[in-house]
Curated annotation (Swiss-Prot):
Listed name of the protein: MFP1 attachment factor 1
Domain comment in the entry: The WPP domain is required for the nuclear envelope localization.
Organs and tissues of expression: Expressed in young tomato leaves, young fruits, and flowers (at protein level).
Primary location class: nucleus
Biased composition (Polar residues): 134-152
Organism: Solanum lycopersicum
Nucleus listed as a keyword: yes
Subunit comment: Interacts with WAP through its WPP domain. Binds to MFP1 and FPP proteins.
Length: 152
């Protein structure tokens, strides 16, 4: 009789575990090393190849872009990690990480292009008008519309 009860209880446990959905837990933070390497590779590509960013700020040589990308990613990872708390589910930290990378990348290319622009400005005069928001008088447009009377 004890064997029958044991077999029935074991069957019940087996059925319960089969009926329960498999719960898989994953953590979004911290990112795996593979993910971090992918971020670095994408940064290198963004910094060293022609893009919208490079049209405005120029490109970096491959070796400089590689070093800069690693530094940007490490600093962003450290900054995001310092904001982490047990209450966060990871998505907020990942957003901080992403924003830090973007901010640092822009700051890097801006600071790199500023000295180049300054030395370039010393060698030749600026081709832009003093206030680019105002229409150019050279084009003959003043921005004003005058009325014209016509005869019927």
């Amino acid at each position: 009789m004890a064997e029958i009860d044991s077999a029935q209880s074991q069957e019940t446990v087996t059925q319960e575990t089969q009926n329960k959905p498999m719960t898989t837990s994953f953590s979004i933070w911290p990112p795996t090393q593979r993910t971090r390497d992918a971020v670095i590779n994408r940064l290198i590509e963004s910094l060293s190849t022609p893009s919208i960013l490079s049209k405005r700020y120029g490109t970096l040589p491959q070796d400089e872009a590689s070093e800069t990308a690693r530094l940007i990613e490490e600093e962003a990872f450290a900054a995001a990690g310092s904001t982490a708390s047990d209450a966060d589910d990871g998505i907020e930290i990942l957003q901080v990480y992403s924003k830090e990378i973007s901010k640092r990348m822009i700051d890097t290319v801006k600071s790199r292009s500023a000295p180049a622009a300054a030395s370039e400005g010393e060698s030749k005069p600026s081709e832009l008008p003093a206030d680019a928001s105002e229409p150019s008088s050279a084009s003959g447009l003043t921005g004003e519309v005058s009325s014209v009377e016509t005869e019927p």
